[in-house]
Amino acid sequence: NNSNSVFDSTQVTFPKLLQKAGYQTAVIGKWHLISDPVGFDFWQVLPGQGVYYNPPMKNAQGMVKTQGYVTDIITDLSLDWISKRDKTKPFVLMCQHKAPHREWEPNIKDLGFDKDRVYPEPPTLFDDFANRAKAVGENDMTLEKTITPKDVKLVRPPQLDAEQAAVWDAYYEPRNAAYQKANLSGKDLVRWRYQRYMHDYLATVKAVDDNVGRLLKYLEAEGLAENTIVIYSADQGFYLGEHGW
């Protein structure tokens, strides 16, 4: 939680129970609980929130360097674990993606995938939350007040290698120069932030879609789909229209 308390790994958790029942267990990707995972035969997780590009990870042996995009890496590790598991035992895998957590940094290969499409603005883009539940207006998650230069890619992520940085700069630098020249303010600035957010967010989600697809196709190809329960859940996203609460 936001107080950064350490998860109590001595308590009963469902991976522990399944492990005791004979399941192979693994967690790969986002963890964000400070304490090391317990109840897993294999784990490799991101320290804290992790980063999108070339993320360091941690497993039972210590820190691990990786190269590439975090959503691809988590999926690659997940597929590798499934393929090497003991096929005589049932298994549970928690494939936990960082994306699309803030700052919504897309896979380099997906930059511009939507060809600068102009996205329709929701009628609630300038909502003042006056007719909403009190908690909605108190949350710090608006395009007007909350967005930072890093959120809208006016700052390049420091984790990029030279090749990744070149692609990043080729995409963002001319668009950022046009933004700086326009010197936007007020509602025009909110509108620009909305378009930038949508392009980045959807490009980031595209990688999740692609990689969930890879995982499902693997289950089908290996004859595991009919006997495997897949649970998909997510908890990320700014207000982009519907927020009645």
Give the ranges of each region predicted by the language model.
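Formylglycine-dependent sulfatase
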Residues: 1-245
